[in-house]
Amino acid sequence: MEDSRETSPSSNNSSEELSSALQLSKGMSIFLDILRRADKNDDGKLSFEEFKAYFADGVLSGEELHELFHTIDTHNTNNLDTEELCEYFSQHLGEYENVLAALEDLNLSILKAMGKTKKDYQEASNLEQFVTRFLLKETLNQLQSLQNSLECAMETTEEQTRQERQGPSKPEVLSIQWPGKRSSRRVQRHNSFSPNSPQFNVSSPALLEEDNQWMTQINRLQKLIDRLEKKDLKLEPLEEEVIEENTKPHIMLVQRQMSVTEEDLEEFQLALKHYVESASAQSGCLRISIQKLSNESRYMIYEFWENSSVWNRHLQTNYSKTFQRSNVDFLETPELTSTMLVPASWWILKNN
């Protein structure tokens, strides 16, 4: 489908020139779109980090992704261009060669029909306008039905692959070190979305006090990381915490940092709202807190999960994958994700 992300005339021209130069066969223009969407710094090629951010599917390990990257990189430049992507995937398309060709025709047909609708709808009769609306709705229904079938097939194949693997390696989850400046990590609480925020109404206002307690714990973690970065770190005696045998010792804290493009801010907020609502309803999700940094389109999402297994299962859900795919278009740079195990005793349930 046609991507809504705007491009400059120069980038459009370069894409047309590249397409002409490569003489792409029918259906292969999708790889021009893949390159444009995954190429976050707009240099016309994909680094390994950009490749990993776009192609990681939660099944291949980091090592396997690295091997695939260098297999595709036949020019040995440590970057991928459209020619290399087309050359590799064209050898493995099978029946999907016809699918991609049909999608290319469908994309052009839909754009042509919508252009005609935009031009003629206002002057059409009531009956003609009704027919246009009906056809748009039914076209959308057909496309959504196809999308549902594809999502089921995708989920089934991924699950089958995981089950068939002997001693499966750990799926790739982006884990990038914290930025160097401590100030960029500091929580600015006055800009956080509180549980009763009209923009992110994902929690009951009754949990506001609990939210404040959790922000205290988050600040405590960030101060600890700040101290660890200092060169004059002095080790101090620790207070030992005695854990009962049947007590779960740790929970998982996930920090996700997302820099959103200004033009996609509203769409991102809607996608984030749907994601938080779905994730919060999952068993094993203890808490999700969202903050927007001052004067920036940068979001910090803190997710608390019962353990790493629950978190990894969450990554394979449809709602999580949908959010990850949408972020390819909405984010200026690939998402930064860090995980940390924290004492489970910090989690205080109010309803105990």
From Swiss-Prot:
Residue span of region Disordered: 155-202
GO (cellular component) term, any one: cytoplasm
Segments forming domain EF-hand: 26-61, 60-95
Annotated Polar residues bias: 190-202
Positions where Phosphoserine occurs in the chain: S4, S192, S197
Pfam families: ABM
Key word Cell division present: no
Name assigned to this protein: N-terminal EF-hand calcium-binding protein 1
